[in-house]
Curated annotation (Swiss-Prot):
Protein purpose: Transcription factor that controls hypaxial muscle development by down-regulating myod1 and cdkn1b/p27, thereby allowing myoblasts to proliferate before the onset of terminal differentiation.
GO biological process terms, semicolon-separated: cell differentiation; muscle organ development; myoblast proliferation; negative regulation of transcription by RNA polymerase II; regulation of DNA-templated transcription
Regions recorded as binding DNA: 125-184
Cross-referenced InterPro entries: HD, Homeobox_CS, Homeodomain-like_sf, HTH_motif, LBX_TF
PROSITE patterns referenced in this protein's UniProt entry, alphabetically: HOMEOBOX_1, HOMEOBOX_2
The keyword Transcription regulation appears for this protein: yes
Name of the protein in question: Transcription factor LBX1
Source organism of the structure: Xenopus tropicalis
Gene name for this UniProt entry: lbx1
Length: 265
């Protein structure tokens, strides 16, 4: 009796196992299993393990073959790792690798790409200023004295006359008007500062300017008189002075002594 009961029970267990093996996988088989080890609780999983699991899961997913119902539990657990989380980890790893490569290239100066792949806009180069000749500046200044703003006809005439372009003439007159405006503002500020000064300081400034003018005039007079002096540094003598008469008489006597007289035999 006991042997028959054991045989019946073993056959029942085999039928149950066979029925369980024939059952389809559960609906939430794609959901990854939540580990409860100490390392997983402390959030310190090994990187190699996650990458290997995701890599094998990716290979199994690319095969595009549904798992058979009679697979063992180990293969089912491996297939259960093919989850969106693994795909997200793989995508993130590729993204960070690309960012590292772009950062290294930017540091080495290989490419003008920024970290996020946007090309840097080159800086605009400033245009070189036109070098006007002295004749051109003289003619432009002379025209600016009585005409601050030019009509199109006048602008064309000046440009053709001086060998310039219309843009160069326009730019010169704009800069000249701006310079005149700055000069007027500086003069106005100087007048306002003089008005705020006390009378004593104004008198002191005037006396200093007068002294400077006097010293400059004295220097000019001394320079104008210096060529009239002789090489020896003495004043030139007038022809009617006694010193000149003595000097001429000495020269005449010396000439008379040097002259030889021829006597006939």
């Amino acid at each position: 009796m006991t042997s028959k009961d054991e045989a019946k029970s073993s056959s029942v267990e085999e039928r149950r196992r066979h029925a369980l093996d024939l059952l389809p996988p559960p609906a939430n088989s794609n959901k990854p299993l939540t580990p409860f080890s100490i390392e997983d609780i402390l959030n310190k999983p090994s990187v190699r393990r996650s990458y290997t699991i995701c890599g094998t899961a990716h290979l199994l997913s690319t095969a595009e073959k549904p798992p058979a119902a009679g697979l063992p539990l180990s293969s089912r657990a491996l297939l259960s790792q093919t989850s969106p989380l693994c795909a997200l980890e793989e995508l993130a790893s590729k993204t960070f690798k690309g960012l590292e490569v772009s950062v290294l290239q930017a540091a080495e100066g290989r490419d003008g790409m920024t970290i996020f792949g946007q090309r840097q806009t080159p800086k605009k180069r400033r245009k070189s200023r036109t070098a006007f000749t002295n004749h051109q500046i003289y003619e432009l200044e002379k025209r600016f004295l009585y005409q601050k703003y030019l009509s199109p006809a006048d602008r064309d005439q000046i440009a053709q006359q001086l060998g310039l372009t219309n843009a160069q003439v326009i730019t010169w007159f704009q800069n000249r008007r701006a310079k005149l405006k700055r000069d007027l503002e500086e003069m106005k500020a100087d007048v306002e500062s003089v008005k705020k000064m006390s009378p004593s300081t104004v008198e002191a400034v005037l006396t200093i300017s007068e002294l400077e003018e006097e010293t400059n005039s004295v220097r000019d007079d001394s320079r104008s008189r210096s060529p009239q002096l002789g090489l020896s540094g003495h004043m030139p003598l007038s022809p009617s002075s006694p010193l000149t008469e003595q000097h001429t008489s000495k020269e005449c006597s010396e000439d008379e002594e040097d002259v030889e007289i021829d006597v006939d035999d």
